[in-house]
């Protein structure tokens, strides 16, 4: 089967969408499919294009058997709504032009959103090439940007919702990432039979158990510390400043240390808040390649999974959650809804009200004294991902759905 994936994010970027596209594509190649990925030059979230690609408008390469076509985008840091919109639309146009000229014959087009402008690329190409268009919805745009307060103009919202509905209607198939997506999308008048769910998962081979990296722990001066970690995006949706304020509350607990690794629109704010509060119990590091991140998981005792207190996140099953469980680390999270139900039912995580540093501090302090829960939560999480959220199984299931189109 010949599969075209259009995605704004792809390795070496480390965004959730980049990982999902790559992990599925690699497995589909191993299962005998020919996979072409049309993406932009890597620049997320810093807006900086690596030296290898600088000055290029087009580049083709092969990554693990995947044909990767990189095309122009307006590279900008993940800051400022209108600059990001320009980045989205520039790639939307360039992806259609390059795909039309370069992809050859394909059996199916998967447009992986967000940003939801990718859906327009897939819809247009599907019509031009007369190829089935599959709309993969990883985030409910424009609902998410409306609830985050990034768009308030009623006319613009109406236009965005009209385009959203047009993409749903024109897609041969819609792929969501959690069960509530079915109800949300079908509430727009879309047949439920057209919507399938392929949840996020984890690469068990990459995120495999690792012995405590004593040398790394020593280099970070974390010996004898209970390390509370967050690895991921420092963005508007995550509310990382709440973690820093939690660290302030626990600053009189010398055994507890916070380790934050990542980048994003709010990174400078987080760094400034740490300095303002004069905290020495918080370490903030720049993004680290996934292959190396495993060592940082090994020195962590508890992982945080924050999202802001917004209704749109009730349907979320963050991909980071599955990496954490694969590494046998217990989770404290602020994600109500689907994630809370899964983690609590499986005895893996504890829920704390979002954007409430006092409650988060209280939960962390309680957990540090509960070695029995820490051990059982770690074991339960590993067993869960091994049995239900292995990328190998999920990719095979996805491919079988595509073959039935």
Give the label of every model feature segment:
Residues 51-59, 208-221:
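A short helix/loop element that forms part of the nucleotide-sugar donor recognition site in Leloir-type
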Residues 180, 201:
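Carbohydrate-associated surface elements
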Residues 186, 192-194, 202-218, 239:
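Acidic anion/phosphate-binding donor-loop and adjacent secondary structure
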Residues 222-238, 243-247, 259:
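Conserved donor-binding/catalytic core segment of Leloir-type glycosyltransferases
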Residues 225, 359, 366, 373-387:
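A short, well-ordered alpha-helix in the C-terminal region of glycosyltransferases
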Residues 259-262, 267-295:
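Nucleotide-activated donor-binding/catalytic signature segment of Leloir-type glycosyltransferases, i.e.
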Residues 302-305, 323-334:
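Short hydrophobic beta-strand element within catalytic cores of glycosyltransferases
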Residues 345, 350-357, 366-372:
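Conserved acidic donor-binding segment of nucleotide-sugar-dependent glycosyltransferases
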